[in-house]
Amino acid sequence: MIQVEDKIISMNIFKKYFVCDLNACKGACCVEGDSGAPLTAEEEKKLNNIYEKVKPYMEEEGISEIEKHGVAVYDSEGDLTTTLVNNRECVFAIEKEEISLCSIEKAYLDGAIDFKKPISCHLFPIRVKEYRDFDAINYEEIKICKPACECGGKLEVPVYAFLKEPLIRKYGEDWYQKLLEATKVLGK
């Protein structure tokens, strides 16, 4: 572990390599899992506010689940998450050419909304656990991301470098620069 400000960071963020390979994994992170994407209360509010603008990008099954249950639910561990379709894929997942993508991100890229996607999705495979006095930043290694680990290894791109944009979105440019300073100390 290494500390940057009040963030405790797993060494795997520096040691492991990662670059998403959608052609290999087919966007499985939007489909596989026991619960939806973790959300903050602010993100749930944002999703409710932009839902009508995202809706044209969504698949019917996702729309139907949101109409029944809303954009977010509490999972079995009591965490706020995006609602699922058939207890499997995120309601915002869409399939294009056999690859699962995010309808929120598609709406963002088209300029329909100003919200890219939930930060937990943007940061994946980093998972952040917020405590009262610090954030724990960990790397979640899962089987479906094996192609991303292989691709990152070939390109020699560590997790923290691949996720530069979402880390800056979450913690700011100044914090990310301090993280880069820490990598120099670590020899990464």
Spans of features found by a protein language model:
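Short loop/turn segments that flank or connect secondary-structure elements
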Residues: 1-188
